[in-house]
């Protein structure tokens, strides 16, 4: 935990919001759902990879987790996304854009805005799969 605490000033200096830092340190919603309703894998232009797992019951997202290979920016954006969509209808979740994730987080460093785009496009990909199956 001491090592994690040492990361805080570095992340702050890079421009991560306090909320984003907490998501990074707590690894919020990182992991796999064993039998998700739907999942989607997507790769960003930087090479980062995100896999999103959703449990959907009666068109409501009841559980959301993700796995990733990438940077702290992706971790913050994906954690924020999963928190934002829990309890949402699939129709409302489908409307989430990268700008919504950035606002929810209180900002990411400008060079990490593409991470929010990767998170939002991975969600759209998962929901497209869901809609095609239902």
Residue ranges and their predicted role:
Residues 1-134:
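Domain-level signature for proteins that mediate thiol-based redox and metal-cofactor handling
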């Amino acid at each position: 935990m001491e090592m994690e605490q040492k990361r805080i000033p570095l992340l702050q200096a890079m421009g991560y919001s306090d909320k984003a830092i907490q998501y990074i340190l707590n690894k919020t919603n990182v992991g796999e759902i064993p039998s998700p309703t739907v999942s989607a894998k997507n790769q960003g232009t930087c090479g980062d990879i995100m896999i999103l797992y959703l449990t959907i019951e009666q068109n409501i997202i009841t559980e959301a987790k993700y796995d990733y290979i990438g940077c702290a920016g992706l971790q913050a954006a994906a954690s924020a996304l999963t928190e934002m969509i829990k309890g949402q209808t699939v129709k409302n979740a489908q409307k989430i854009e990268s700008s919504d994730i950035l606002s929810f987080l209180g900002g990411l460093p400008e060079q990490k805005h593409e991470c929010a785009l990767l998170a939002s496009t991975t969600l759209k990909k998962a929901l497209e799969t869901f809609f095609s199956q239902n």
